[in-house]
């Protein structure tokens, strides 16, 4: 992104004009649908480094006193304590109606593409810059919803967001596929190494 013009250096055909600076809160609404307590909730968590939202599988059941909140497929989530470690994700369909505490808030999206948002906030020039500004020099960096929603974001039209999000998702799928192939080849090589030498 060229800072002065707010236009990216590379664009898809048919899209022109400057991107607009807005606040994240212009596009997200906090969701607080009460769920179960810690003992009964089907839990999910947000992985670090933009790896998404996954089922929480730890043995600890949680406290009867801890309130959980229902999360819906397509919502955006982040980890308050792990903001500076890019704990961001979109709730997948497979985890619809799973729950988290308020330490991992969820938001409904309006006129912003989830894949576009996810890819933007996982860039270091977003989460480090705004995460550090938000909390100064405190050791425990907890980014509250109000602070997050007030952060600026530069966005194109919704149509361009969708195009960018779909393109980046396709690249992620290719990376995953090739990573699996690489792991398989490593395993094949290891098997040969074990059997080809005395």
Which residues does each PLM region occupy?
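Feature detects amphipathic, helix-rich regulatory segments
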Residues: 1-198
């Amino acid at each position: 992104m060229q800072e002065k013009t707010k236009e990216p250096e590379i664009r898809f055909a048919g899209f022109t004009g400057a991107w607009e600076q807005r606040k994240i809160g212009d596009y997200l609404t906090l969701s607080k649908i009460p769920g179960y307590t810690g003992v009964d909730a089907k839990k999910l968590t947000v992985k670090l480094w933009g790896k998404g939202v996954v089922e929480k599988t730890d043995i600890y059941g949680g406290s009867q006193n801890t309130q959980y909140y229902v999360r819906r497929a397509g919502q955006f989530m982040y980890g308050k304590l792990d903001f500076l470690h890019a704990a961001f994700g979109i709730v997948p369909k497979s985890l619809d109606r799973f729950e988290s505490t308020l330490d991992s808030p969820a938001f409904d999206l309006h006129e912003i593409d989830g894949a576009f948002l996810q890819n933007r906030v996982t860039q270091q020039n977003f989460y480090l810059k705004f995460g550090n500004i938000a909390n100064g020099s405190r050791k425990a960096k907890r980014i509250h919803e109000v602070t997050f929603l007030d952060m600026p974001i530069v966005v194109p039209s919704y149509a361009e967001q969708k195009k960018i999000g779909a393109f980046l998702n396709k690249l992620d799928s290719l990376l995953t596929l090739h990573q699996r192939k690489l792991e398989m080849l490593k395993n094949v090589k290891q098997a040969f190494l074990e059997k080809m030498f005395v």
